């Protein structure tokens, strides 16, 4: 058996290069040991010979690229070949796998319009009958109709451990025009012999492309059977009803307009919370990266269930598979309230901790309190390690990020007569804060005590205002006492007897010195107070 090796080859656009080997049993690749590749990335890649269908040779980003079309493993991209490798590579593929190496040239016109070809393993965008670029279906996470003639295609994102950098996350195709879609076949009326013509319905070309891409890329379904499925689940965000299919490593949300695929490693937290209305239960899923509908992002999925709704189901796995993989995580069959069953399935398949209410209880013995965030009304849940506001927008505030919490209440004339209060949560290291308003006054003491138990810094503006007012009043009283002491006997004028020597009617020395009329006698003054004499009548 003769093997042929090629050095410094990159597999599926990986940053690490390695060695590619062709043998009669198949094709293999292994990362180079000297390339600082981590142990997790050093696992060899093996492609059996029976999987290989076709191969193409074209220019790549690191030289020349070999694209291998497979039966069940998508498209395999191997980049980094030299132009001299073409003849040897073609000979080896033909000798070992009876596969012809086809030479393809890419279009370099730079046009942004062309034709799409939905091939077996990838979407090919062609310009002037030459491939302009290819998108493997395995790289497509979601696709949605964002308009009558527009289709958005979202791509998988690299893992959280990869270096931060620029990355294409979405591409949109504008597809004008309509196509005829047959809806009703021709029917002959036996009574009068008339033939009813078949009815046709026009459908947009964008819709046809979207449906075909969804089928090709398996966006609406996953190879294999779902482990468990839930139908017609009400979502508060994003709004609508979705069917949920849960697979070993991912789940599907299928709605009337949007379909989503969510990997379990995207799920960060799961909250199971009873609604304070005592009629519903909420299941909140935090995901990163978030779901997207156009420009709108949804980092939280909020499901609502009737509290008394029940479901009965069995896992769609064999007894052997259940014992090997799921025995310690799931039950073989369920017959209980729907929210309990779904919470247990999410916890078991994602292997994430299920967050439930802690020790906090409102005055109505509920784990949440009614309040408002800006113009939105909802419920605030003080949990063991965080605050969570639902439903729209859903806000997650871990205690570790809280700098301080300010309680404020405003009434007329500076006196607190309001029936509600506001709670402002300031975050560490930023000026960002969340203001929760319209909280019932009776809940304030309970929330304060709970926050103090969690070691959070509390500021009560009402208590501060009362303390400042009391301090100001004490200072005013002290000032009055000091003023009485400084005035001495002057403060006792009311208790002293009248001054016998004082004659209010006599002229003072000051008047004699400065008033030229000071010598006027009392008699003259008394005369001046009398009425003036009447005028004598004129002589006629």
Swiss-Prot record:
Key word Acyltransferase present: no
Keyword annotations from UniProtKB, A to Z: Chromosome, DNA damage, DNA repair, DNA replication, Nucleus, Transcription, Transcription regulation
Spans annotated as Disordered: 475-540
GO MF term list: DNA binding; histone binding; nucleosome binding
InterPro entries per UniProt: PH-like_dom_sf, RTT106/SPT16-like_middle_dom, RTT106/SSRP1_HistChap/FACT, SSRP1-like_PH1, SSRP1/POB3, SSRP1/POB3_N, SSRP1_DD, SSRP1_sf
Subunit structure: Forms a stable heterodimer with SPT16. The SPT16-POB3 dimer weakly associates with multiple molecules of NHP6 to form the FACT complex.
Function: Component of the FACT complex, a general chromatin factor that acts to reorganize nucleosomes. The FACT complex is involved in multiple processes that require DNA as a template such as mRNA elongation, DNA replication and DNA repair. During transcription elongation the FACT complex acts as a histone chaperone that both destabilizes and restores nucleosomal structure.
Name of this chain's protein: FACT complex subunit POB3
Source organism: Debaryomyces hansenii (strain ATCC 36239 / CBS 767 / BCRC 21394 / JCM 1990 / NBRC 0083 / IGC 2968) (Yeast)
């Amino acid at each position: 058996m003769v093997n042929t090796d090629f050095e410094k080859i990159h597999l599926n656009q990986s940053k690490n290069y390695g060695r590619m080997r062709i043998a009669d049993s198949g094709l293999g690749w292994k990362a180079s040991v000297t390339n600082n590749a981590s142990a997790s990335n050093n696992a060899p890649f093996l492609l059996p010979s029976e999987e290989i269908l076709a191969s193409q040779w074209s220019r790549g980003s690191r030289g020349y690229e070999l694209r291998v079309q497979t039966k069940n493993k998508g498209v395999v991209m191997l980049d980094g070949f030299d132009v001299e490798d073409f003849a040897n590579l073609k000979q080896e593929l033909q000798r070992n796998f009876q596969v012809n190496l086809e030479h393809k040239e890419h279009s370099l016109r730079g046009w942004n319009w062309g034709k799409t070809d939905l091939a077996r393993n990838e979407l090919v965008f062609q310009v002037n009958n030459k491939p302009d670029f290819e998108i493997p279906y395995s790289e497509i996470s979601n696709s949605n109709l964002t308009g009558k003639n527009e289709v958005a295609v979202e791509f998988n994102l690299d893992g959280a451990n990869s270096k931060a950098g620029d990355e294409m996350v979405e591409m949109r195709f504008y597809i004008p025009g309509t196509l005829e879609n047959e809806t009703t076949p021709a029917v002959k009326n036996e009574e009068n012999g008339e033939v009813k013509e078949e009815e046709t319905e026009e459908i947009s070309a964008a819709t046809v492309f979207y449906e075909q891409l969804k089928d090709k890329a398996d966006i609406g379904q996953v190879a294999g059977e779902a482990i468990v499925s839930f139908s017609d689940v009400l979502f508060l965000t994003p709004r609508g009803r979705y069917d949920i299919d849960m697979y070993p490593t991912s789940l599907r949300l299928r709605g009337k307009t949007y379909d989503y695929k969510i990997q379990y490693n995207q799920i960060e937290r799961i909250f199971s919370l009873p609604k304070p209305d005592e009629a519903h239960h909420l299941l909140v899923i935090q995901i990163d990266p978030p779901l997207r509908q156009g420009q709108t992002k949804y980092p939280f999925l909020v499901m609502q269930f009737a509290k008394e709704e029940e479901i009965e189901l069995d896992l769609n796995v064999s007894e052997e598979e259940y014992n090997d993989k799921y025995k310690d995580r799931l039950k073989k069959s369920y017959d209980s309230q729907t929210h309990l069953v779904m919470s247990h399935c999410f916890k078991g398949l994602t292997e994430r901790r299920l967050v439930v209410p802690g020790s906090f209880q409102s005055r109505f013995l509920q784990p949440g309190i009614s309040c408002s965030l800006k113009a939105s009304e909802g419920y605030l849940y003080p949990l063991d390690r965080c605050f969570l506001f639902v439903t729209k927008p859903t806000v997650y505030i871990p205690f570790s990020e809280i700098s301080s919490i300010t309680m404020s209440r405003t009434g007329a004339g500076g006196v607190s007569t309001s029936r509600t209060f506001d709670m402002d949560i300031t975050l560490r290291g930023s000026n960002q804060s969340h203001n929760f308003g319209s909280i019932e006054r009776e809940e304030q003491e309970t929330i304060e005590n709970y926050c103090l138990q969690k070691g959070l810094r509390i500021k009560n503006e009402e208590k501060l205002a009362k303390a400042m007012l009391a301090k100001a009043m004490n200072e005013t009283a002290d000032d009055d006492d000091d003023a009485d002491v400084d005035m001495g006997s002057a403060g006792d004028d009311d208790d002293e007897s009248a001054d016998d020597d004082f004659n209010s009617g006599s002229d003072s020395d000051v008047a004699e010195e400065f008033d030229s009329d000071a010598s006027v006698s009392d008699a003259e003054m008394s005369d001046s107070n009398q009425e003036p004499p009447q005028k004598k009548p004129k002589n006629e």
